[in-house]
Amino acid sequence: MWFKNLMTYRLTKPLDWDLAQLQTQLEDCQFHPCGAQDQSKFGWSAPLRGSDLLYFSVGKQILLVAKKEEKILPANVVKRELDERIESLEQKENRKLKKVEKQTLKDDVVMNLLPRAFSKNQHTALWIDTENNLIHVDAASSKRAEDALALLRKSLGSLPVMPLAFANEPCTILTNWIVQDSLPHWLIALEEAELRGSQEDSVIRCKKQPLENEEILALLQDGKKVVSKLALEWEDTLTFVFNEDCTLKRLKLADSVREKNDDILKEDFAQRFDADFVLMTGILAKLTENLLGEFGGEKTRL
């Protein structure tokens, strides 16, 4: 349940989050495992183990989990089987097969292999902050986040969202933090960053290297590079990598934070899940608020 990434989206129009209605809407897109001939399945699964509800809610915070099952068919296995069939049929009919015939054979090969294929399961969590009209997705890529949002849009019928963007250019703020040693008191820069130049391939990745290094500072001060990614620690609570597209990657809560609810018995799984969700959302909501303030608020949309 602990988020490892944070891609945040602004609801451009408030929605009515009636939970009974939400459950009904989610059930229309509920996850069902792949059948023998299915290559993939995508739908909602229960966030809380053993629950029939396809959402988990505490106060004004809602958690959803999109589950995707994909059959794994290695390309070399499909190719080997297909090549054998093509060769056999071409010899039998004494002619070269047309492109459309080869595609038909390939589809047949895939259908025959699917029942024997292994499955890969992927879960994507969405945290809906109805109080602040934000949706946070635990995804490391935009595609994965957009897929989950598309599923929610399909369930609700409408989902007016845009990626959260800050008013001030993030790379300018990040660069100034390092050059001017002006990080806010609640943040500590760790020894990891990515410096980007004007050319797309002109990237320097720094790891386990003090960012006050003279060479790094010279590049930034001369305007040859800007900081596009920066590893940070927030109030001894968590570490993360801030990206210039306003996404947070590699979120890691401190052990002391994750252990705060250890007094709850393991048998009380639902109570522990509830407490951990409240803890996590409280921390990440505060961090989001802090970052918005530091980056000049939210970018005005035209």
Residue ranges of model-derived segments:
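Intrinsically disordered, low-complexity, charge-rich terminal extensions
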Residues: 1-302
